[in-house]
Amino acid sequence: MTITAIASGKGGTGKTLVAVSLAHALAHLDERVLLCDADFGLANAGVHLGVSQCGDLKGVLDGTKALKDAVVRVESGRAGFDLLAAPSGVLATTGEAAVERLLTALQHAGHYDRVIVDLGAGVDANVMTLAARADEVLLVVTPDPASLTDAYAFAKILLRRTTSRVPYVLVNMAMNATEGRRIAEALLASARAFLRATPEFLGFIPLDPRVSDAVRRQRPLLTQFPQTPAATALEGIARKLHGQPAPVAAAGLR
């Protein structure tokens, strides 16, 4: 079982769309998937999916409910996945002990092939704890310069906590492949120079007006608009994750 954390240094990168889409795509690759919305302050995976029941993450965090009793099933075409979330804002004051309970539950969820954890944006303590304990971290950035700056800060803090978690980098909302690679290389060059680590560029998602259409309709992009460039890119990224090991860490920081 692999725990994949989806992270971003700032809000507005499309992180939750990526998490929801990868859950959908990996389920269609015959993985048994759990999507955990761990954005404790602003949970919205359920909104993206258009579901009214999103599970009982609060019960898992406070220790009153077992994971298997707290998830809900989301049907996704010929496949489906489980969802563990809570209404937005309900878990804004989640503490360290509750996060440890969640981690324990996820790490023992061996009946899944993959657990996708949609982290909160930024670098607060809960976010970094969850990222450091994941098996792999996918860091979502956009062409916005602030996104790059904050993504570098995220990678720096993560690597200071654990050098075994060199993140993948995924560029969202790129105009084309050239811009996607340019944005990724800017972040990778800084990481090589100052963090002595080489994150792996996982790919890019093109700027696509159908993405916002799917979000407004509260329908998953890959079922609502499966032939769009963004959907095709996300399916390709899922295939890479499905058969590709996490990048190897370098030794130390400076």
Locate predicted features.
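NTP-binding/hydrolysis catalytic cores, primarily Walker-type P-loop NTPases
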Residues: 216-254
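G-domain G4 guanine-recognition motif of GTPases
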Residues: 9, 142, 167-182, 204-211
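Gly/Ala-rich phosphate-binding loop of Rossmann-like dinucleotide-binding domains
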Residues: 27, 131, 159
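Beta-strand-loop-alpha "switch" segments that mediate conformational coupling across diverse proteins
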Residues: 195-222, 234
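Conserved C-terminal guanine-recognition region of P-loop GTPase G domains, centered on the G4
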Residues: 148-163
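Walker A/P-loop phosphate-binding motif and the immediately C-terminal alpha-helix
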Residues: 2-39
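P-loop/Walker-type NTP enzyme "switch/lid" segment
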Residues: 35-113, 215-220
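Inter-motif core of Ras-like GTPase G domains
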Residues: 110, 124-146
